[in-house]
Amino acid sequence: MDYYRKYAAIILITLSVFLHILHSLPDGEFTAEECPECKLKENKYFSRLGSPIYQCMGCCFSRAYPTPLRSQKTMLVPKNVTSESTCCVAKAYTKATVMGNIRVENHTECHCSTCYHHKF
């Protein structure tokens, strides 16, 4: 009888550890090592029944390469590495009012283009 209690306890502990690990994994958004492609995704915070709000999400490319010597000579502060990247941004959008008086952009089309947050 004591043997079965130990066996049951081990099974329950193993099951609880497995469920804890399973529960701690993300909900499938970024489970792959690679980032998903740039596309529209519903914004669950601003969306309401019958009036979904979409935003562009995903990854585009970025790369770094050695700066050509002739380009380094023209720089005020020469840098050995030049980087280039694009971000997932809205190609087209409409203005929408949510929660009474908050104006947001409801993205309708996405593409990879200049990263706007770098332009401040």
From Swiss-Prot:
Main location: secreted
TM ranges: none
Record's subcellular location: Secreted
Matching InterPro entries: Cystine-knot_cytokine, Glyco_hormone
GO molecular function: follicle-stimulating hormone activity
Short name of one Pfam family: Hormone_6
Disulfide bridge map: 35-59, 38-88, 56-110, 60-112, 87-115
Keywords of the record: Disulfide bond, Glycoprotein, Hormone, Secreted, Signal
UniProt KW Nuclease keyword: no
List of glycosylated residues: 80, 106
Subunit structure: Heterodimer. The active hormones thyrotropin, lutropin, follitropin and choriogonadotropin are heterodimers composed of CGA, a common alpha chain described here and a unique beta chain which confers their biological specificity to the hormones: TSHB for thyrotropin, LHB for lutropin, FSHB for follitropin and choriogonadotropin subunit beta/CGB for choriogonadotropin.
Function, as annotated: Shared alpha chain of the active heterodimeric glycoprotein hormones thyrotropin/thyroid stimulating hormone/TSH, lutropin/luteinizing hormone/LH, follitropin/follicle stimulating hormone/FSH and choriogonadotropin/CG. These hormones bind specific receptors on target cells that in turn activate downstream signaling pathways.
Protein name: Glycoprotein hormones alpha chain
Taxonomic placement: Eukaryota, Metazoa, Chordata, Craniata, Vertebrata
